[in-house]
Amino acid sequence: ILSLSLLDRSTRCKGTGKSCSRIAYNCCTGSCRSGKCG
């Protein structure tokens, strides 16, 4: 089971260093719905 606390707070995408919300957890893989990712 993944720790929700890790996804709960904003996480920096690997490589990009941009912050993403838990909803945009897939931002690091290229998928981002909400939050600043690119």
Curated annotation (Swiss-Prot):
Expression across tissues is: Expressed by the venom duct.
Its localization reads:
Secreted
Propeptide residues, chain positions: 1-12
User: Annotated site (Important for calcium channel binding), which positions?
Assistant: 25
Q: Cysteine amide modification sites?
A: 37
Task: Share any extra remarks.
Answer: Negative results: has no significant effect against all Cav subtypes tested, except for Cav2.2, as well as against TTX-sensitive sodium channels of mouse DRG neuron.
This protein is called what?
A: Conotoxin FVIA
Native source organism of the sequence: Conus fulmen
